[in-house]
From Swiss-Prot:
Family label: Belongs to the universal ribosomal protein uS17 family.
Gene Ontology terms describing biological process: translation
Gene that this sequence comes from: rpsQ
InterPro entries per UniProt: NA-bd_OB-fold, Ribosomal_uS17, Ribosomal_uS17_bact/chlr, Ribosomal_uS17_CS
Claim: rRNA-binding is one of the keywords in the record: yes
PROSITE patterns assigned to the protein according to its UniProt record, in alphabetical order: RIBOSOMAL_S17 (PS00056)
Domain of life: Bacteria
Cell inner membrane keyword on record: no
This protein's GO CC annotations: cytosolic small ribosomal subunit
SUPFAM superfamilies assigned to the protein according to its UniProt record, in alphabetical order: Nucleic acid-binding proteins
Annotated protein name in UniProt: Small ribosomal subunit protein uS17
A single GO molecular function term of this UniProt record: rRNA binding
């Protein structure tokens, strides 16, 4: 018997908080077409993700993947840092 490989959901967003230990808050923005008016509207969602090495800083663009629940609100893990935030 061969088992089908399960696809893992991944999302890309911007880190808006890194104040927690080994956790980050990622803002995911998407554009959705309004069902009645047809206008494209920006919607956003904040997801908490696990950052094992505490590498992320505010402003970084990251990719996160869905995982098992790690806490009450955290069920995503950091896959990679796409782009570092510029230091001013």
């Amino acid at each position: 018997m061969t088992e089908a490989k399960k696809l893992v959901r991944t999302l890309t967003g911007k880190v808006v908080s890194d104040k927690m230990e080994k956790s980050i808050v990622v803002l995911i923005e998407r554009r959705v077409k309004h069902p009645v008016y047809g206008k494209y509207v920006s919607k956003s969602t904040k997801m908490k993700a696990h950052d094992e090495a505490n590498d992320c800083k505010i402003g970084d663009t990251v990719t996160i993947a869905e995982s098992r629940p790690l806490s009450k609100t955290k069920s995503w893990t950091l896959v990679k840092i796409e782009e570092r935030a510029t230091q001013i």
